[in-house]
Amino acid sequence: MKIRSQVGMVLNLDKCIGCHTCSVTCKNVWTSREGMEYAWFNDVESKPGVGFPNDWENQEKWKGGWIRKINGKLQPRIGNRALLLGKIFANPHLPGIDDYYEPFDYDYQNLHTAPESKHQPIARPRSLITGQRMDKITSGPNWEEILGGEFEKRAKDQNFENMQKAMYGQFENTFMMYLPRLCEHCLNPACVATCPSGAIYKREEDGIVLIDQDKCRGWRMCITGCPYKKIYFNWKSGKSEKCIFCYPRIEAGQPTVCSETCVGRIRYLGVLLYDADAIESAASTENEKDLYQRQLDVFLDPNDPAVIEQALKDGVPQSVIDAAQQSPVYKMAMDWKLALPLHPEYRTLPMVWYVPPLSPIQSAADAGELGSNGILPDVDSLRIPVQYLANLLTAGDTQPVLLALKRMLAMRHYKRAETVDGKVDTRALEEVGLSEAQAQEMYRYLAIANYEDRFVVPSSHRELARDAFPEKSGCGFTFGDGCHGSDTKFNLFNSRRIDAVDVTSKTEPHA
C-alpha cells in the first residue's frame, strides 16, 4: 500500500443557481489572454444538452478516456502507442474551433468614430482570430443556457441513453439542472498517458494535474485523450493549457478562485488519502457500474491508526493527515454517500464529485404531487429522471443516486419536524440508515455551509522551494517574453506565432 494525498472537490448541484460567477472569475484570472479567448477552464452547462464543446460526452466520436481490453488491461480509447503516433500529424478525433465557438468581440470604437448618418451606428461582431466581420454568431460558450434552442438538438445529450427521451421534449415533462464543470484532476488521467512529449504530470503532494509549458510541443493528443474535454490549445503560444486547480492558492492553504467566489456556496474542498497501488485494479474493473464503488475502495480512512502510520512513512505530512480528518469531501463521498463522480465509466477515477440536485423534487413533494413510499416521497417518479442522473454520475446504476436523494430528503424531513413541529421525528432517518448526529452534521455542511467547513485545505510544505516573491504580479504564460506578448520559439517549426487582432478599434469605411 502506497498512500498519497489529493485535494478533491465536491459541488452541490442542489444549490447551484447557474449565475456563472465561477466561470467569469476563472476566465478573468486564467484565460483572458491572446490565444485562449475561446477557453473556459470552468463553465456551467444547462442539462439536458450537448454541452461545451459540442457533444463532449460522445466518446465514440472523440475517443476520450480508457477502455478495458479482453485481457483486463487498460488502454487509451484513442489507441495504443503505435496507433497514437500514427495520428500525431492528422488526428481525426480532435475538436475544431466550431465545436467550441469562434471567439468574438465588437468594434465599439465605431460608436464613437462613425460619421453623421441617418442610421444609428452599431458595434458589429468581429472574430478575435481573423479580425474579420462575422455575419452571424452561431455558437457561444453558453449557447444552451436555460434550455436554449429546440429540444431536437438538446436531445443528442448522451445521458438520455436507455431512456424514452421523446417524452421529455413536451413542455409538461421538461426538466433542467446546472452542471458546473472543470478539470477532474483524475487519479488515472488519460491525458497524461496520451501526451507524446510527456509534458503532463500529476503532482505527488496534492494530486493536481499540470502541463509543463516548456515540454509541451502542441501535439494536442491530450485534448483527445481527456474525456471531459477540459484541455485547450493556445493558438498563440502553440501549447496546450488546462485548469491548474489554482495551485498557487492551494499551496497557501486557500481555496480555488471558483470556490472562493461561488455565490451559492456549492463548492467544497478537502483532502483525501488514497492507496496509489490500488488505482490500476480499480480502474480495470470489468463492470462499469462497479467503478463507483471500486473508487470508494481506493480512498482510505484518515482516522485509522494503521493508515496514519503508513501515511507518515510514505511522506504525507501530519498537517495533511489532520486536514483529511476534517475533510468535507470525505464526509460527503464516504460517510454520507451523497457525492458521486462524473462519468466514472471513462475509467479515469475523477476527483471532482457532485451531489445530485433535489430542489425541483422537494417542491413537488411538498405540494403532494409525488407518491409516498413510507415516510419519504417516492423518488422513482421525480421530475428529474433518476436514470438521467445515474447515466451522468454512476454509469447508469440508479441505486447510489436513489440513496443520495433519499438521504437529503430524510435530512430535510428531520429538520422540518425539529424546527416547525418542535419534535424529533427520526423515522425518515431510520429508513435511509442515518443517525441524528449525521443528520445534524449534514445540515451544517449543506445548508449553513460555513467557510471553515467547506474549505479545509492545508498549506503545502515547500520549505526548500525557491522564493516566489520576484514572480509576484508578473505575467504568466509569456515564456520570458515580458508582458507585451506570448511569442515563443518552443514549437515544432521554430516559427513566430501570429498576433491576435485588436478588433475594438477596427472599423469599416462608410459609404
Place the predicted regions along the sequence by residue.
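Non-ligating segments of multi-cofactor redox enzymes
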Residues: 1-511
